From Swiss-Prot:
Highest taxon in the source lineage: Bacteria
Function, as annotated: Binds together with bS18 to 16S ribosomal RNA.
Nucleus found in the keyword field: no
Protein name: Small ribosomal subunit protein bS6
Lineage, top ranks: Bacteria, Pseudomonadati, Pseudomonadota, Gammaproteobacteria, Alteromonadales
Organism: Shewanella sp. (strain W3-18-1)
Protein backbone atom coordinates (compact mmCIF):
# COMPACT_ATOMS: atom_id res chain seq x y z
CA UNK A 1 0.00 0.00 0.00
CA UNK A 2 1.11 3.53 -0.70
CA UNK A 3 0.94 6.71 1.35
CA UNK A 4 -1.22 9.63 0.24
CA UNK A 5 -1.96 13.16 1.38
CA UNK A 6 -5.52 14.21 0.61
CA UNK A 7 -6.98 17.70 0.93
CA UNK A 8 -10.55 18.51 0.01
CA UNK A 9 -12.52 21.73 0.19
CA UNK A 10 -16.23 21.74 0.98
CA UNK A 11 -18.82 24.41 0.13
CA UNK A 12 -19.13 26.69 3.20
CA UNK A 13 -22.93 26.25 3.31
CA UNK A 14 -22.36 22.50 3.74
CA UNK A 15 -19.99 22.77 6.73
CA UNK A 16 -22.43 20.92 8.98
CA UNK A 17 -22.11 17.89 6.68
CA UNK A 18 -18.31 17.72 6.98
CA UNK A 19 -18.21 15.31 9.97
CA UNK A 20 -20.45 12.87 8.07
CA UNK A 21 -18.29 13.20 4.96
CA UNK A 22 -15.14 12.56 6.99
CA UNK A 23 -16.75 9.49 8.54
CA UNK A 24 -17.82 8.19 5.12
CA UNK A 25 -14.40 8.73 3.51
CA UNK A 26 -12.45 7.28 6.45
CA UNK A 27 -14.83 4.30 6.38
CA UNK A 28 -13.96 3.66 2.74
CA UNK A 29 -10.27 3.67 3.63
CA UNK A 30 -10.52 1.44 6.70
CA UNK A 31 -12.81 -1.07 4.93
CA UNK A 32 -10.01 -1.58 2.39
CA UNK A 33 -7.56 -2.30 5.27
CA UNK A 34 -6.09 1.18 4.89
CA UNK A 35 -4.66 3.27 7.72
CA UNK A 36 -5.37 6.90 8.55
CA UNK A 37 -2.18 8.46 9.88
CA UNK A 38 -3.41 12.04 10.24
CA UNK A 39 -6.83 13.68 10.02
CA UNK A 40 -7.26 17.43 10.46
CA UNK A 41 -10.40 19.49 10.04
CA UNK A 42 -9.11 23.01 9.37
CA UNK A 43 -12.57 24.56 9.33
CA UNK A 44 -13.63 27.48 7.16
CA UNK A 45 -10.78 29.40 5.60
CA UNK A 46 -10.43 32.24 3.14
CA UNK A 47 -9.77 31.17 -0.46
CA UNK A 48 -6.88 32.66 -2.42
CA UNK A 49 -9.28 33.34 -5.28
CA UNK A 50 -13.06 32.94 -5.70
CA UNK A 51 -14.36 29.51 -6.71
CA UNK A 52 -17.96 29.51 -7.99
CA UNK A 53 -18.33 33.05 -6.53
CA UNK A 54 -17.35 31.75 -3.07
CA UNK A 55 -14.64 33.36 -0.96
CA UNK A 56 -14.45 30.74 1.81
CA UNK A 57 -14.40 26.96 2.00
CA UNK A 58 -14.20 24.26 4.67
CA UNK A 59 -10.84 22.43 4.46
CA UNK A 60 -10.03 18.85 5.52
CA UNK A 61 -6.58 17.20 5.42
CA UNK A 62 -5.97 13.44 5.59
CA UNK A 63 -2.76 11.42 5.42
CA UNK A 64 -3.56 7.81 4.66
CA UNK A 65 -2.02 4.53 3.64
CA UNK A 66 -4.32 2.70 1.24
CA UNK A 67 -4.44 0.69 -2.00
CA UNK A 68 -4.61 2.63 -5.26
CA UNK A 69 -8.11 1.28 -5.97
CA UNK A 70 -9.38 2.83 -2.74
CA UNK A 71 -7.89 6.20 -3.66
CA UNK A 72 -9.58 5.99 -7.07
CA UNK A 73 -12.87 5.27 -5.28
CA UNK A 74 -12.34 8.33 -3.06
CA UNK A 75 -11.57 10.55 -6.06
CA UNK A 76 -14.78 9.34 -7.73
CA UNK A 77 -16.73 10.12 -4.55
CA UNK A 78 -15.21 13.63 -4.49
CA UNK A 79 -16.08 14.15 -8.16
CA UNK A 80 -19.75 13.21 -7.72
CA UNK A 81 -20.26 15.11 -4.46
CA UNK A 82 -21.50 18.61 -5.34
CA UNK A 83 -20.45 19.92 -1.91
CA UNK A 84 -16.75 19.21 -2.64
CA UNK A 85 -15.40 22.26 -4.47
CA UNK A 86 -11.83 21.02 -5.00
CA UNK A 87 -9.70 18.07 -3.98
CA UNK A 88 -6.07 17.13 -4.24
CA UNK A 89 -4.52 13.70 -3.77
CA UNK A 90 -0.72 13.44 -3.66
CA UNK A 91 1.32 10.29 -3.25
CA UNK A 92 3.99 10.60 -0.55
CA UNK A 93 7.03 8.47 0.19
CA UNK A 94 6.40 8.08 3.93
CA UNK A 95 3.51 8.36 6.35
CA UNK A 96 3.17 11.87 7.74
CA UNK A 97 1.88 11.79 11.31
CA UNK A 98 2.99 15.06 12.92
CA UNK A 99 0.68 18.06 13.02
CA UNK A 100 0.58 20.24 9.92
CA UNK A 101 1.74 23.88 10.06
CA UNK A 102 -1.94 24.90 9.97
CA UNK A 103 -2.77 22.78 13.02
CA UNK A 104 0.35 23.92 14.88
CA UNK A 105 -0.51 27.58 14.24
CA UNK A 106 -4.04 27.01 15.54
CA UNK A 107 -2.71 25.23 18.67
CA UNK A 108 -0.27 28.06 19.36
CA UNK A 109 -3.00 30.64 18.88
CA UNK A 110 -5.34 28.73 21.20
CA UNK A 111 -2.64 28.35 23.85
CA UNK A 112 -2.05 32.13 23.88
CA UNK A 113 -5.71 32.76 24.60
CA UNK A 114 -7.21 32.45 28.04
CA UNK A 115 -9.59 29.69 29.10
CA UNK A 116 -12.58 31.61 27.72
CA UNK A 117 -10.87 32.04 24.35
CA UNK A 118 -10.02 35.65 25.11
CA UNK A 119 -6.58 37.22 25.19
CA UNK A 120 -5.66 39.26 28.19
CA UNK A 121 -5.36 43.03 27.81
CA UNK A 122 -1.55 42.80 28.19
CA UNK A 123 -1.25 40.20 25.40
CA UNK A 124 -3.45 42.19 23.03
CA UNK A 125 -1.64 45.43 23.83
CA UNK A 126 1.81 43.83 23.38
CA UNK A 127 0.73 42.44 20.02
CA UNK A 128 -0.58 45.85 18.90
CA UNK A 129 2.69 47.63 19.65
CA UNK A 130 4.76 44.80 18.18
CA UNK A 131 6.46 43.38 21.26
Amino acid sequence: MRHYEIVFMVHPDQSEQVPGMIERYTGVITEANGTIHRLEDWGRRQLAYPIQDLHKAHYVLMNVEAPAETIEELETAFRFNDAVLRNMVMRTKVAVTEASPMARARDERDSRRGPAGERSYDEAHAEEIGE
